[in-house]
Amino acid sequence: MAGVAQNGHQEMDFCMKVDPLNWEMAADSLKGSHLDEVKKMVAEFRKPVVKLGGETLTVAQVAAIAAKDNVKTVKVELSEGARAGVKASSDWVMDSMGKGTDSYGVTTGFGATSHRRTKNGGALQKELIRFLNAGVFGNGTESCHTLPQSGTRAAMLVRINTLLQGYSGIRFEILEAITKLLNHNVTPCLPLRGTITASGDLVPLSYIAGLLTGRPNSKAVGPNGETLNAEEAFRVAGVNGGFFELQPKEGLALVNGTAVGSGLASMVLFDANVLAVFSEVLSAIFAEVMNGKPEFTDHLTHKLKHHPGQIEAAAIMEHILDGSSYVKAAQKLHETDPLQKPKQDRYALRTSPQWLGPQIEVIRSATKMIEREINSVNDNPLIDVSRNKALHGGNFQGTPIGVSMDNARLALASIGKLMFGQFSELVNDYYNNGLPSNLTAGRNPSLDYGFKGSEIAMASYCSELQFLANPVTNHVQSAEQHNQDVNSLDLISARKTAEAVDILKLMSSTYLVALCQAIDLRHLEENLRNAVKNTVSQVAKRTLTMGTNGELHPSRFCEKDLLRVVDREYVFAYADDACSANYPLMQKLRQVLVDHALQNGENEKNANSSIFQKILAFEDELKAVLPKEVESARAALESGNPAIANRIKECRSYPLYRFVRGELGAELLTGEKVRSPGEECDKVFTAMCNGQIIDSLLECLKEWNGAPLPIC
């Protein structure tokens, strides 16, 4: 700040020699980790007061005011320090009008008809609001053609913030009235469509102005969802003194800005940033349940690629996997039996940091662009009191919003594509390293198809998300008698990005439920394998150790190889009928005995030392006891008394599992139960939409110091 002019307007030193083009400021805003930024956003979202001064509004604060659950707890306060500047610009307009100064929108017509002139400034503003009330609502205050109340609240907040900077020629009292509407949860009804954001969001913002001026067609929604006319809205909000008679320039100040698009964009980007972190953690959990090889997160790999988003994504996944009980078990398996799975994991796992990194960078960049926009002055003309002039320009052009929303939507679609790729591997027993097909957890796979329907739903979600990735901003139509021949379409793009966020939430919630299912299946797998191993060992000792006369039998040496078969064989390949001759367990156990018999040489000719003679006894004994032991192990787990505890409790990803299973009560799904996958996914989706899942997500990363593990 350089000082204060005589008329009270703050005089900005915009021609500073340091960073005159704002590139340094833009770069500085990206310092630090994305995760720290998300944590800061969450903290700001939860603060009880949003203080507006015109220059420090954040997307998190906009999202907080917009959120339905926050309307009674988060309030807006205006900076009293801004009053003088706002008054100075308003006074300047009235003075210039009195002096006969010719100013756009004050003494002239609008747009392509700005050649017209009038001295009746108040009537001109009244007509501006009337002809811009061109929206169509259909029936009801929340019809499909009405902007959601959250979007309207966001727009109101952003518009107040812009006008507080004192370049727009509007009275402070009008800003106070809009603030009262926000704080008393009285929301004007705005049309969903009808803006191209070339001269600002003219049509929707005119309905806020219509309510303030008491237009008979204006409507609002009250604190309890009731429909209010303008008079009732003022009474409920405690706005005294009657409706506003707009002075010259005030109508233009209210409508000629980008607040609707940038407000919705702020809401969208708050969610998008959280979803980006969520996708990183889900990718790490995917690596855990797939017995993945953690070297894909090694810092050297990503440091050599240079991209910060990729480096951070890898470091976050590395942190989750570091010390993971699943990773330790998988590493032991890979060391002792390196041929049991491919040398490298598939791309959806192995290249997830490379895939997610650019999307995080795009979302972060879009967030900064929108934060600059919501703190900008974006109407026309701008009142420069210090130089005693009105500047005619084009800050109402919402291109930063349209472009950032197109980019963010493409990033969200890419995140969804990765999620679908991971989900498809997870439910496919050809790829998932021993998990059952469709993640079925029931006793009879012929009557349990697990997540088959969910995979179909995921394909649907992903297809729609990929369609939404198509850009909006290349569909510009010349408008308003070719005066607005280029326009940003920012609200359309923001709306489509809001749809994309909603679909990615559907995908994320479905995927998380599937990952929790996989975690429980790994737990079941471990307990069943333990039961089978113990049973095979005991049966081998009883039937293979001694001969008929009590002598040691050559078949006693088979036990180690029999147990190796149990270790190597996928449990769910035989779990529904462990002793079936058609399943690989019994086939391979028999093959071990046959191989030992073939190596037994001349001893096979002696009935007392023949291993072949022992095969039938071993199999009969095993068939008699193994099914009972398998069922007993399953029943013990279902009753909460498993022989082996769930590994997830020893992992940094545990908070998300605990949230789903504990707080939400979403259970392991089987065909034996009535509950459907959609019911459980709905619980997670609702929690995600309400922000309930954020704390558990961040708890997974609470120990991360913001840096990758050292290269050693």
From Swiss-Prot:
Among InterPro entries, the record links this protein to:
Aromatic_Lyase, Fumarase/histidase_N, L-Aspartase-like, Phe/His_NH3-lyase_AS, Phe_NH3-lyase, Phe_NH3-lyase_shielding_dom_sf
Q: Which UniProt keywords apply?
A: Cytoplasm, Lyase, Phenylalanine catabolism, Phenylpropanoid metabolism
Quote the PTM field. Contains an active site 4-methylidene-imidazol-5-one (MIO), which is formed autocatalytically by cyclization and dehydration of residues Ala-Ser-Gly.
The reply on keyword Lyase is yes
The family annotation for this protein states: Belongs to the PAL/histidase family.
The entry describes its oligomerization and partners as: Homotetramer.
What is the name of this protein?
Answer: Phenylalanine ammonia-lyase
Protein's organism:
Nicotiana tabacum (Common tobacco)
